[in-house]
A protein has these predicted regions:
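Rossmann-fold NAD(P) dinucleotide-binding segment
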Residues: 74-77, 91-110
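NAD(P)-dependent Rossmann-like dehydrogenase/reductase catalytic/cofactor-binding core
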Residues: 285-346
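C-terminal substrate-binding/catalytic lobe of Rossmann-fold NAD(P)-dependent oxidoreductases
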Residues: 22, 33-34, 41-74, 170-308
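Short, Lys/Arg-enriched N-terminal segments with co-localized hydrophobic residues
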Residues: 3-18
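N-terminal Rossmann-like NAD(P) cofactor-binding module of classical short-chain dehydrogenase/reductase
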Residues: 83-87, 108
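Rossmann-fold NAD(P)-binding glycine/threonine-rich loop
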Residues: 111-135
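Glycine-rich Rossmann-fold phosphate-binding loop(s) that bind the pyrophosphate
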Residues: 28
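Oxidoreductase and adenylate-handling cofactor-binding alpha/beta cores
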Residues: 145-161, 176-186, 310
Length: 346
């Protein structure tokens, strides 16, 4: 029924009519499927096409009216979609794909390698400006919603301390690292905030916390037959950049237990700023923002789709180049008019 409504959907605001925002998805993994589901909940949008590196005949999507095409066919859709959402990985896909496709489409990505965001921004900005397109990068919850809350909190409380805690939730990157270990058949890793550290921040103690003091890691590992459990546990706990700096617990479980008890991809976390105001800094304040997510990729996708609306609107205004969540006014995200927002949410 929703897709029938979308086919007929014309929004009228102050006498102006416009059709649905036509979305393309590049990459159909967990994030791509999440974007497809999110589009279904936004009646001013329609999914037009999914681009895949796989054989299109092997890709089964949920939207009956959308097409599945090879990535090599993307250029043929240059004038058929309004925004292309890039759902690849940050390690190797997005650094290449986002600048490339910003020369053809208005684009949105979820690039999350924090240290490389300035470089990625510059590359996308150059490509988008040359093509007269608009790109929004690093959209999601961290970077994304957490970033916005850090910025707001720092602007409001210029004297203070920032804290970010992640979890409890599945870290897909750390889970991948576990699965790369010889003898590991499958695995999930949870990042867990240290409750005493979180409470110290909430109490206004402004603690100086090490990596180990902020989070613990819990691993659920399925072994290949005959694998050396002691060796694997030691290798996990000593793995640099992933587990060596944390108190890590390793559980060896069956494949069935992993699938039934750890089949989801939950996540979340906290962004806090503890600060002071007053002539003599006599008053303390705490700003806390929390996310608790059943599905990390589906929530990330929902944020991305809201920013796809912003990309469409900014492009319609003639804006070009790259943007981040810092650069975009909140009203651009909403399907509601400014008049309605002021009447109902302000």
């Amino acid at each position: 029924m929703l897709h029938l409504l979308r086919d007929l959907f014309i929004i009228k605001r102050k006498g102006e009519s416009f059709m649905s925002i036509r979305i393309g998805i590049l990459g159909y993994g967990n994030l791509g499927r999440g974007v497809e589901c999110a589009i279904r909940q936004n009646l001013d949008m329609e999914l037009a096409v999914v681009f895949t590196r796989r054989n299109p005949e092997d890709v089964r999507i949920l939207t009956e009216t959308a097409k599945v095409c090879r990535v090599s066919e993307a250029e043929q859709w240059k004038d058929k979609i309004d925004v292309l959402i890039l759902c690849g990985g940050s390690a190797t896909d997005l650094p290449v794909q986002t600048p490339k496709y910003a020369s053809l489409f208005n684009v949105v990505d979820s690039f999350d390698t924090h240290a490389r965001i300035p470089e990625h921004f510059a590359n996308v900005d150059e490509a988008a400006k040359q093509a007269g397109k608009l790109g929004i990068i690093s959209v999601g919850w961290d970077p994304g919603m957490f970033s916005l809350n850090r910025m707001y909190a720092n602007a409001i409380l210029p004297e203070g301390s920032d804290y970010t805690f992640w979890g409890k939730g599945v870290s897909q990157g750390h889970s991948d690292a576990l699965r790369r270990i010889e003898g590991v058949k499958n695995a999930k890793q949870y990042t867990i905030p240290v409750e005493s550290a979180l409470e110290a921040v909430r109490a206004g103690e402004n603690p100086v916390l090490t990596t180990r003091q902020k989070h613990t890691r819990e691993c659920f590992v399925v072994l290949e037959e005959g694998a050396d459990a002691a060796r694997i546990e030691k290798e996990i706990k000593e793995m640099p950049n992933y587990f060596a700096d944390y108190d890590t617990t390793v559980h060896f479980i069956s494949e069935e237990e992993l699938l039934t008890q750890h089949g989801g991809i939950p996540h979340g976390g906290f962004v806090l700023r503890s600060g002071v105001t007053g002539w003599n800094r006599e008053n303390r304040h705490l700003i806390e923002y929390r996310l608790k997510l059943d599905s990390n990729p589906e929530f990330t996708s929902s944020v991305i789709v809201a920013y796809a609306r912003a990309a469409y609107r900014l492009a319609k205004e003639g804006q070009t180049g790259c943007r981040t969540v810092f650069d975009i006014a909140p009203a651009y995200l909403s399907p509601t008019t400014g008049e309605e927002l002021r009447a109902t949410m302000l």
